[in-house]
Amino acid sequence: MSKVLIVHTRWYPESIEIMNHISIEILEKKYSFEKVAAPGAIELAALAKSKIIKNEYVGIIFNGIVIRGATSHYDLISNEAYRSIGSLAENFCDIAVINNVICVENEDQLKERLEKNTKNNTCLLYTSPSPRD
């Protein structure tokens, strides 16, 4: 059975658990999976890279949450997380890479997007053929 890597952040653990549960529920029908936790969104791509160099995965899904605060930290973290995940996708183009890092202004927006985005993004990974698959 082909294997998918689920890389998630440790921030907002209750919401991340929902995201991971949705991803696993969809993926386990077709794939085995490994789940690993990064300290935060900025470390997601580096952790994934360390794992995919050593193992064969057909896909990666990144589950994370960044909520805007009162400083520019949100902009720095969200931009760098997206840039590094995009760079990883370019460098490992034989693996399906799905970015499900949800960047929102507040918790109300998170509630609106959490389940829908995770289901939609995981389904993309589920249905995307990978050259490694």
Q: Where in this protein do the model-derived segments appear?
A:
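Active-site rim loops that border cofactor/substrate pockets in soluble metabolic enzymes
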Residues: 30-53
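Glycine-rich phosphate/diphosphate-binding loop of Rossmann-like nucleotide-binding domains
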Residues: 5-32
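Glycine-rich phosphate-binding loop
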Residues: 47-85, 89
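Phosphate-binding/catalytic loops
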Residues: 104-122
